[in-house]
Structure formats: structure tokens, C-alpha cells
């Protein structure tokens, strides 16, 4: 199994997205309208490591705010 995170609001990302223009340019691609939090990624990892996922195999756990589901290839 694999944990596939989307953009997570960390100090490093916050430093890069230091203007409203830069931040909004990224947010427009996230259907949930916000960046992920580290705790949300941790919860996914804990699920994969738990007995709750004991019958889950060969899967990608997408925690990306809907980016993958909404992605369209530019023409």
C-alpha cells in the first residue's frame, strides 16, 4: 500500500507561498479549497499501519483534497 499526499501546509510550503497570488494559484487546483494538514497525513499512515487495513493490499491511499479526482489533462 502507499500513502499519496497532496500539498501539506508546512513551514517550507508556507515560505514558498508567501504572497496571496502564489497561494491562490495553488489553491485553485485543490477542490477542497485548502492545503492539507500534517495530522491528516499522519491519520492516513496510522490507518495503513493498523489492523483496520488488514485486508487492504496493493492500494494507493490518496489524501490530496481531491486533486487527483478533479485532474484533467490540458489540451
Describe the predicted segments one by one.
Residues 56-58:
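Short, small/polar-rich loop/turn modules that mediate ligand/substrate recognition or access, typified
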Residues 5-15, 69:
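Short, flexible catalytic-loop segment of classical short-chain dehydrogenase/reductase
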Residues 15-30:
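A short C-terminal helix-loop "cap" of Rossmann-like NAD(P)-dependent dehydrogenase/epimerase domains
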Residues 30-41, 52:
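A conserved structural motif in NAD(P)-dependent oxidoreductases
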Residues 1-9, 49-52, 62-64:
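Conserved SDR Rossmann-fold cofactor-binding beta-strand/turn motif
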Residues 73-75:
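A short alpha/beta connector and helix-capping loop motif
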Amino acid at each position: 500500500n502507499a500513502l499519496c499526499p497532496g500539498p501539506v501546509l508546512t513551514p517550507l510550503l508556507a515560505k514558498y507561498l508567501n504572497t496571496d497570488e502564489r497561494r491562490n494559484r495553488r489553491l485553485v487546483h485543490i477542490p477542497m479549497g485548502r492545503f492539507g494538514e500534517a495530522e491528516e497525513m499522519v491519520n492516513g499512515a496510522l490507518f495503513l499501519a493498523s489492523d483496520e487495513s488488514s485486508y487492504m493490499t496493493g492500494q494507493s491511499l490518496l489524501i490530496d483534497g481531491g486533486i487527483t479526482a478533479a485532474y484533467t489533462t490540458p489540451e
